[in-house]
């Protein structure tokens, strides 16, 4: 889990969600059908290392052309990991900036900075960061 997330509820369901031989990750907020967001992930090194790290090392020049770890992970999962991929339910996380995952990217997402009911994690991708927020719910939960 990234350090720039705000935990609002217990994380137990994230731990219990997938089996040891599955890779769990949240879907991207801007292009959820195409990419993953690496802010919240869970995997077992016994099998995921080969699919991500060893794949990255083997095809380093290709992966250097991609922007950021999220794109590397998405590419590696699309290449090797579909059978073990189990994305977390969208309603468990939300973007601080965009209330709903929308397609196309930067659709008519509102910027109300409100908590999404029943979500456990608010993801701060890009700017602002949690310590820059003026919302009380962020200040109360960012520790």
Segments predicted by a language model, with ranges:
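Short, glycine/charged-enriched secondary-structure capping and boundary segments
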Residues: 14-16, 38-40, 56, 136-138
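GT-A fold catalytic core of metal-dependent nucleotide-sugar glycosyltransferases
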Residues: 1-35, 42-43
């Amino acid at each position: 889990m990234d350090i720039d997330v705000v935990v609002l509820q217990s994380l137990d369901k994230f731990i219990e969600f997938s089996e040891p031989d599955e890779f769990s990750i949240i879907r991207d907020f801007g292009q959820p059908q195409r990419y993953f967001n690496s802010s919240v992930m869970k995997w077992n090194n016994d099998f995921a290392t080969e699919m991500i790290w060893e794949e990255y090392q083997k095809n380093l020049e290709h992966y250097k052309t991609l922007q950021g770890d999220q794109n590397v992970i998405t590419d590696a999962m699309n290449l090797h990991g579909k059978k073990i991929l189990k994305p977390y339910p969208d309603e468990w996380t939300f973007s601080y900036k965009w209330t709903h995952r929308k397609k196309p990217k930067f659709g008519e997402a509102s910027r109300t900075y409100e908590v999404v009911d029943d979500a456990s994690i608010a993801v701060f991708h890009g700017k602002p960061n949690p310590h820059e927020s003026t919302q009380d719910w962020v200040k109360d939960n960012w520790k």
